[in-house]
Amino acid sequence: HAWWVRTQKALPARIPLPETLCFEDICERLRAAAVEDTCRTYTENSFFCRSTYRFDGRFLLVRMENFQKADFDAVKKRVNHAVNREFHLPQRYAAGELAYKMRFYILYTEAANDELMRHISRNAETLLRRAEGVMTFVLCGDSLIVPPLYGDADTAAVRRYAGAIRMMRDLLRHPRAH
């Protein structure tokens, strides 16, 4: 049945949040959980911080009215380049640290279009198996949209996936510091 699982197209899941958050509210909640002096606004519609809440994570929040993958990739590239230059973050980690290293991309939008839903529905299992796992979330209205996990996900990827969803849900539900 492994071929069947790999060929199925899974849909992102919507997790309801207790309230609708604006871009600034999300920035504040990330800032409350951030490592001191790591919060940056590199563009008008992006916010970066590092946090050690549940993961040693890099967070990039991007506001997009109408998702276009090329625009999102350009923002990611520009911000990641600036972050690497400013913070001199290592590209290699000790084996014991890898399970906790993550990059989180959070897209904030008023309405999720088809291109956005296709984008977050691709490759979650592959991105979570990287040394520094990568996960993309979407915040749309009062919902957290999470990518589907299907295919050849190993136990470590499933743990990262479940832990990342719990972490995001907690960060967005509670405005206090973690």
Where are these regions (language model features)?
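Ordered hydrophobic segments in well-structured contexts
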Residues: 46-65, 102-108, 133-148
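Exposed alpha-helical structural elements
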Residues: 25, 74, 115, 160-163, ...
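Catalytic cores of nucleic-acid endonucleases
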Residues: 66-128, 132-136
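Short, flexible helical or helix-coil boundary motifs
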Residues: 11, 33-37, 86, 165, ...
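Compositionally biased amphipathic helical and low-complexity segments enriched in hydrophobic
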Residues: 12, 18, 22, 31, ...
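Charged, structured surface patches that assemble and position nucleic-acid processing machinery
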Residues: 120-178
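N-terminal, charge-rich interaction modules
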Residues: 3-64
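General structural signal for secondary-structure boundaries
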Residues: 22, 68-71, 159
